[in-house]
């Protein structure tokens, strides 16, 4: 029953949490949305500097919230991959320093494995095997979760990730950053059937289409051309709500079809969803309904565990620590490590 202090700094949230197995003792998240909003996206150098400014206050708050002392903590964890290198280094260096000072084992964690473990934070009874749909600003993947550290990627995006597509379409519609939440809100007042948009299919060299891979660049381009056409016809009245609803519904429909098809083909009877786009209300609606229709259990974590946080990192780290998996203090951060290579982070 390991208790872990975990740090997450892979992108633009500075987060610290203390987790006992699947129970959250404290969780602190300092968002940088306001900092990057002016630029329409995350500026890596600014993100790293902000992590340096914020990390100590987050550590102090997490310890205070937990009512625990260092004698109660069994290990220190940090996200080591993937992510922005400079941002990752802030969390990794901080965690390693704490591990040395307090003589605790260090546990490096894969960010996507953290999103998988967010499922357990809200439902501690959930266990592998299951299919995980990971959808965020940087990733769109269908992952067969076999056990702690052992994953098979069955589907991925070939270009833009789903969350990235939301941000880019929001920019086209002058809705600001981040795009996901504002499109979700606006779509509630629009007609999702107003415009027919392509779901995006990935062609195979031998012909046909990949059943589980995604592509969103064509959808983004279709929205751009539609906006250009509509602006020519009526420069004073762009149907932004209808465009947002049609785009969002298309993304949700595509992800739902691929997830259900993958689960059925592989005989998997449960799907967990993780990542920032898991907060999207239309995706939740469509996938839950499809799950009921096909007798597949579908789990979405609460909204607070969809976006980046350190509690999910701590949950994954605790599981690894319980199994005797620890990381070397010489372990380097890695901006592109695949989810299938998670066990490269550990010595055991």
UniProtKB/Swiss-Prot annotation:
Broad class of where this protein is predominantly found: cytoplasm
Superkingdom of origin organism: Bacteria
Keywords: Acyltransferase, Cytoplasm, Iron, Metal-binding, Transferase, tRNA processing
Keyword Zinc carried by entry: no
Subcellular compartments: Cytoplasm
Chain sites annotated for binding Fe cation: 111, 115, 308
Catalytic activity: L-threonylcarbamoyladenylate + adenosine(37) in tRNA = N(6)-L-threonylcarbamoyladenosine(37) in tRNA + AMP + H(+)
Cofactor(s) the record lists: Fe(2+)
One MF annotation (Gene Ontology) recorded for this entry: N(6)-L-threonylcarbamoyladenine synthase activity
One Pfam family from the record: TsaD
GO biological process: tRNA threonylcarbamoyladenosine modification
Family statement: Belongs to the KAE1 / TsaD family.
Function summary: Required for the formation of a threonylcarbamoyl group on adenosine at position 37 (t(6)A37) in tRNAs that read codons beginning with adenine. Is involved in the transfer of the threonylcarbamoyl moiety of threonylcarbamoyl-AMP (TC-AMP) to the N6 group of A37, together with TsaE and TsaB. TsaD likely plays a direct catalytic role in this reaction.
Protein name: tRNA N6-adenosine threonylcarbamoyltransferase
Lineage of producing organism: Bacteria, Bacillati, Cyanobacteriota, Cyanophyceae, Oscillatoriophycideae
């Amino acid at each position: 029953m390991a208790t872990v202090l975990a740090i997450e700094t892979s992108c633009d949230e500075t987060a610290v949490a203390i987790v006992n197995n699947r129970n959250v003792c404290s969780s602190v998240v300092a968002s940088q949305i306001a900092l990057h909003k002016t630029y329409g996206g995350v500026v890596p150098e600014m993100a790293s500097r902000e992590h340096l400014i914020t990390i100590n206050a987050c550590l102090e708050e997490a310890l205070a919230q937990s009512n625990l002392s260092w004698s109660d903590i069994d290990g220190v964890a940090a996200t080591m991959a993937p992510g922005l290198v400079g941002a990752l280094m802030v969390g990794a260096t901080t965690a390693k320093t704490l591990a040395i000072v307090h003589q605790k084992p260090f546990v490096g964690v894969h960010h996507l494995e953290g999103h998988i473990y967010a499922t357990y934070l809200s439902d501690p009874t959930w266990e592998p095997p299951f299919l995980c749909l990971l959808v965020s600003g940087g990733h769109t993947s269908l992952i067969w979760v076999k056990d702690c550290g052992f994953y098979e990627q069955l589907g991925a995006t070939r270009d833009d990730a789903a969350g990235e597509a939301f941000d880019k379409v929001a920019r086209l519609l002058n809705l600001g950053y981040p795009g996901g939440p504002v499109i979700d809100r606006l779509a509630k007042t629009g007609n999702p059937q107003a415009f027919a948009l392509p779901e995006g299919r990935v062609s195979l060299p031998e012909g046909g289409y990949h059943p589980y891979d995604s592509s969103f660049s064509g959808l983004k381009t279709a929205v751009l051309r539609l906006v250009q056409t509509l602006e020519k016809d009526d420069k004073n009245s762009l149907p932004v709500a209808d465009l947002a609803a049609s785009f969002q519904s298309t993304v949700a429909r595509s992800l739902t079809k691929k997830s259900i098809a993958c689960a059925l083909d592989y005989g998997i009877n449960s799907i967990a969803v993780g990542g920032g786009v898991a907060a999207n209300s239309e995706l939740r609606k469509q996938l839950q309904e499809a799950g009921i229709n096909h007798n597949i259990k579908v789990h979405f974590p609460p909204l607070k565990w969809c976006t980046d946080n350190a509690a999910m990192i701590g949950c994954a780290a605790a599981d690894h620590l319980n199994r005797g998996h620890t990381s070397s203090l010489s372990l380097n951060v890695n901006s592109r490590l695949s989810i299938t290579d998670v066990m490269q982070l550990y010595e055991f």
